[in-house]
């Protein structure tokens, strides 16, 4: 996957990703309309399909809500690269099939607007704009399968056939 980097800092919690006032719906399109709006009012206009979210430490901390990764995925973000993720967000992202990678070096080496290419299977992150490459820990095979099928529910459906 390849897209433009959209970059934010540390400790972005789930209440910032999708504010509680919008939790009365689980419609991905509606969630996408309000994704990150308390942090960046232009987020929904800034994101194009396939863009890559690049964030700092402890991304997705706070309340456990599947709405947060759903909103990000529905907004068009194809992958999140972070210095670190809150564990519950990490699991929720995998469960809905949103690719996520941890790499401090990549986050430090990518600027807003850079074109970034990601090979999730092998944990390779390339800053196409700067010609640099970074490594992240690739997922185990079963996690790759969950992401490939678009989330845990689709994965289970496929396996029980």
Curated annotation (Swiss-Prot):
Pathway membership, UniProt: Amino-acid biosynthesis; L-leucine biosynthesis; L-leucine from 3-methyl-2-oxobutanoate: step 2/4
Alphabetical keyword list: Amino-acid biosynthesis, Branched-chain amino acid biosynthesis, Leucine biosynthesis, Lyase
Superkingdom of source: Bacteria
GO MF entry, a single one: 3-isopropylmalate dehydratase activity
CDD domains: IPMI_Swivel
Class of this enzyme: lyase
Xref: InterPro entries: Aconitase/3IPM_dehydase_swvl, AconitaseA/IPMdHydase_ssu_swvl, IPMI_Swivel, LeuD, LeuD/DmdB_bac, LeuD_type2/HacB/DmdB
Function, in words: Catalyzes the isomerization between 2-isopropylmalate and 3-isopropylmalate, via the formation of 2-isopropylmaleate.
Similarity annotation: Belongs to the LeuD family. LeuD type 2 subfamily.
PANTHER family from the UniProt entry: 3-ISOPROPYLMALATE DEHYDRATASE SMALL SUBUNIT 1 (PTHR43345:SF2), 3-ISOPROPYLMALATE DEHYDRATASE SMALL SUBUNIT 2-RELATED-RELATED (PTHR43345)
Subunit comment: Heterodimer of LeuC and LeuD.
Record protein name field: 3-isopropylmalate dehydratase small subunit
Source organism of this protein record: Caldanaerobacter subterraneus subsp. tengcongensis (strain DSM 15242 / JCM 11007 / NBRC 100824 / MB4) (Thermoanaerobacter tengcongensis)
